[in-house]
């Protein structure tokens, strides 16, 4: 059974981990956020916010994962 998130702090921690993982995957492509966002048609301000663990829509996250060529399952597999 999956663990439940027990507090707002935990949600914030999870958001930061999601952002860190997006940043890690982008950096593995040897791209800074400005170049990567331009090449993939993603607003650089939005990408920067996501990478900092700020609010992100599911639609935006799915678009980014598609551009990174990463499945949702693989992306969340390492996030605890």
Language-model features and meaning:
Residues 2-28:
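A short, Lys/Arg-rich alpha-helix, primarily the initiator
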Residues 26, 37, 65:
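The alpha-helix within a helix-turn-helix
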Residues 53-66:
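Short, basic-rich loop-to-helix N-cap that marks the start of a DNA-contacting helix
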Residues 25, 39, 50, 78:
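Residues in the recognition helix of alpha-helical DNA-binding motifs
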Residues 29-48:
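Short alpha-helical DNA-recognition segment
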Residues 22, 33, 44, 58-61, ...:
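Helix-turn-helix DNA-binding elements, focusing on the entry/boundary residues of the two helices
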Residues 69-80:
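Short C-terminal boundary/hinge segments that cap the last helix of small helical domains
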């Amino acid at each position: 059974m999956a663990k439940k998130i027990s507090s707002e702090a935990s949600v914030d921690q999870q958001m930061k981990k999601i952002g860190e993982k997006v940043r890690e995957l982008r950096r593995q492509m040897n791209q800074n956020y400005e170049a990567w966002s331009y090449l993939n048609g993603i607003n650089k301000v939005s990408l920067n916010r996501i990478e900092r663990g700020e609010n992100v829509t599911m639609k935006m996250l799915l678009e980014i994962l598609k551009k990174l060529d990463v499945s949702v399952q693989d992306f969340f597999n390492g996030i605890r």
